[in-house]
From Swiss-Prot:
<keyword id="KW-0479">Metal-binding</keyword>
<feature type="binding site">
    <location>
        <position position="145"/>
    </location>
    <ligand>
        <name>Ca(2+) 4</name>
    </ligand>
</feature>
<feature type="domain" description="EF-hand 4">
    <location>
        <begin position="128"/>
        <end position="163"/>
    </location>
</feature>
<dbReference type="GO" id="GO:0005955">
    <property type="term" value="C:calcineurin complex"/>
</dbReference>
<feature type="binding site">
    <location>
        <position position="106"/>
    </location>
    <ligand>
        <name>Ca(2+) 3</name>
    </ligand>
</feature>
<dbReference type="GO" id="GO:0097720">
    <property type="term" value="P:calcineurin-mediated signaling"/>
</dbReference>
<dbReference type="GO" id="GO:0030431">
    <property type="term" value="P:sleep"/>
</dbReference>
<comment type="subunit">
    <text>Composed of two components (A and B), the A component is the catalytic subunit and the B component confers calcium sensitivity.</text>
</comment>
<dbReference type="GO" id="GO:0007269">
    <property type="term" value="P:neurotransmitter secretion"/>
</dbReference>
<feature type="binding site">
    <location>
        <position position="74"/>
    </location>
    <ligand>
        <name>Ca(2+) 2</name>
    </ligand>
</feature>
<feature type="binding site">
    <location>
        <position position="33"/>
    </location>
    <ligand>
        <name>Ca(2+) 1</name>
    </ligand>
</feature>
<feature type="binding site">
    <location>
        <position position="111"/>
    </location>
    <ligand>
        <name>Ca(2+) 3</name>
    </ligand>
</feature>
<feature type="binding site">
    <location>
        <position position="100"/>
    </location>
    <ligand>
        <name>Ca(2+) 3</name>
    </ligand>
</feature>
<feature type="binding site">
    <location>
        <position position="147"/>
    </location>
    <ligand>
        <name>Ca(2+) 4</name>
    </ligand>
</feature>
<keyword id="KW-0677">Repeat</keyword>
<feature type="binding site">
    <location>
        <position position="63"/>
    </location>
    <ligand>
        <name>Ca(2+) 2</name>
    </ligand>
</feature>
<comment type="function">
    <text>Calcineurin is a calcium-binding and calmodulin-binding protein found in all cells from yeast to mammals, and a calcium-dependent, calmodulin-stimulated protein phosphatase.</text>
</comment>
Amino acid sequence: MGNETSLPMDMCSNFDADEIRRLGKRFRKLDLDNSGALSIDEFMSLPELQQNPLVQRVIDIFDADGNGEVDFKEFIQGVSQFSVRGDKLSKLRFAFRIYDMDNDGYISNGELFQVLKMMVGNNLKDTQLQQIVDKTICFADKDEDGKISFDEFCSVVGNTDIHKKMVVDV
């Protein structure tokens, strides 16, 4: 599969050629059926994602064309956001997209509830979770439109070091 060598280097600006080769090897190991793309099951074999309750959202974001699989180009572009050389804004945008499930540029009350539900499972009653969601929206929603924009999201989490935790070794 010569796919990884035909990628334009500007697309992978957070990785050098050596890292791309290593990622290519890793991708081929994960691609158990040699289809040239990772299914959800193949993607789930990544140790970094196995215990992550948001794995489906990560896959949805990596799967840029929405065909249900992650090809090598999508894999590189997705993982690139977690490079140590990735910038803070890109990492914050990725984190925002985890919550922005319908990709409309806003985190609605319902979206925040769904994502938090993925994280807490049944550890909280839905009424308790809804209270947390409502308080979070009230706190972050500076223009009082009932939803959280990317700028509002950044003003809340941008001062944290979350972007420093969004790193994978290649």
